[in-house]
Design a protein with these regions (language model features):
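Asparagine-centered strand-capping/turn motif at beta-strand->loop junctions
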Residues: 65-69
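Extracellular/periplasmic metallocenter environments
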Residues: 1-30, 45, 55-58, 70-75, ...
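Extended, solvent-exposed segments with strong compositional bias
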Residues: 99-116
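N-terminal edge beta-strand
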Residues: 34-62
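Short aromatic-acidic-glycine turn motif
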Residues: 82-93
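A detector of mature, structured extracytoplasmic domains
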Residues: 93-99
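Extended low-complexity, serine/threonine- and proline-enriched intrinsically disordered segments
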Residues: 74-84
Length: 159
């Protein structure tokens, strides 16, 4: 399935609004079938507010991201220092520190916007090889706490 959208990307200028066209490819397949549309890895966003994914992902390529939860999620992929663990990340969030985490690195990151329950998308990216963390900062619909603070993060290696 291919949908083509045209939308204004800036307000009106001297010659009128500026428009851009983008294409979105989706699937008519049931997103709960356990398979991605391509041959690449699958990352699942779960109702337990966790990521289920391979520990190693490609540094460049396409992954299928499936929201198998009953709530919305999104995913950011951010670089962290080699050797960083999920336990360290959780300890930092639990500390409620107001400084940049000591394990975070400046560098390119990618992500996707909100994905509704039962939906999937193909995320294509190119990042330097290294250690990264997957995180979701959607606020919990009951507590208001960001999902990442509740444990929705996963350290992965991009090769």
């Amino acid at each position: 399935m291919l949908k083509v959208f045209t939308c204004p990307c800036r307000g009106p200028g001297p010659t009128g609004p500026k428009f851009t066209t983008f294409k979105v490819r989706g699937s008519d397949r049931d997103s709960a079938d356990g398979q991605g549309d391509g041959d690449g890895p699958v990352i699942r966003l779960t109702s337990a507010d966790r990521f289920v994914s391979p520990r190693t992902l490609p540094a460049r390529g396409t992954v299928t991201v499936k929201n198998v939860a009953d709530t919305i999620h999104f995913m950011a992929i951010s670089p962290v220092k080699k050797g960083t663990t999920d336990k360290q990340i959780q300890a930092f969030f639990d500390s409620k520190a107001q400084v940049q985490p000591p394990f975070f690195l400046n560098g390119p990151s990618v992500g996707m916007d909100v994905l509704s329950p039962g939906r999937q998308l193909e995320l294509t990216y190119k990042l330097p090889a290294g250690t990264y963390v997957l995180m979701c900062f959607i606020a919990d619909d009951v507590t208001g706490m960001p999902h990442a603070f509740m444990g929705m993060h996963k350290v992965v290696i991009l090769k």
